[in-house]
Amino acid sequence: MSAPRLEIDLEAIADNTRTLVSQLDPLGIGVTGITKASLGSPGVAAAMLKGGATGLGDSRVENLARLRAGGVTTTTTTLIRSPMVSQAALVVRDADISLNTEAAVIDSLAAAALSQGTTHGVVVMVELGDLREGVPVADVVDVCRHVVKTPGVVLTGLGTNLACQSGVAPDQLKMDELSQLVEKVETSCDRGLSIVSGGNSANLDWALSTADAGHINDLRLGEAILLGTEPLHRRVLDGLRTDAFTLFAEVIEVKTKPALPWGDTAQAAFGTPPARHDGELVRQAIVALGRQDTDPHGLAPPSGIITLGMSSDHLVLDVGDHDVSVGDELSFSLGYGALLRAATSPFVTKLEVDSA
């Protein structure tokens, strides 16, 4: 088989979705499955829907278009990054809903929707402290009123995002504040909100321990479904599988070399050279895998093998006395950043399998 290769176990993704849906359902919280770390794979999307996700979301409109082209047409799709004005027509065509913070963008979406003879759903995002996207709390009602009075768009809900930019953790106080804003908006705009999206996989620590979810009825889950982990502490969540993704790469050199480089040293290809530990000799393997293919942070080699460094196209490993030869394939588990880059690299073959 071709390498490097990302193997995707679709049943593991369905299992994780099913587990999270069953855990969140008693709280009245549905799951929007986020496909961006799979490059909008229709197969991954179908697995999420099989597991009970109530909708799908992605940060790139191109990925949402890929879902539709791949036959995923029977569920609500949400663009989870604030739309670009230049893509307003594409957003209206390929997404049912988008997360928004700017009146100018909302107006562009409205104009595009009217020209296409349709309407587009708007979820207004609220800034609750992580300092990425979001309308200041004091301005939320005014922005929502603007949506309500603008033909072509429909005020669908409120949402927030935490833990992505500044690491601010979702907690009961943050979620209560969002719920209180929902009541304020519903009263001021004289209409109910169908979606109150409390955040992403980082919300699961809160959601699975809270006694009161308030008005929160949606979470946008990617990492937890795909990797079985939560982003705050990279902890494996109870009942979730961590074997949905495996990256395979081929060994192209195995040689015993000195433990330390020699000669005058300066910057390496990506800045400061990686530290090398003193010693006499290292049995070193090079794998045909580089930063063009994945992120070295979050890339875990087989047990007992040590990563020495990675450049654009080469991964250097200390394989010790492991039985490793040229032409062999080694398997790697992935953290979120490593998965995201591997899934989006054109040099990594994707192979979806169904273990059911």
Q: Which residues does each PLM region occupy?
A:
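Active-site anion/phosphate-binding pocket segments in diverse small-molecule metabolic enzymes
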Residues: 176-356
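A short, Lys/Arg-enriched amphipathic alpha-helix followed by its capping loop at the start of a domain
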Residues: 23-29
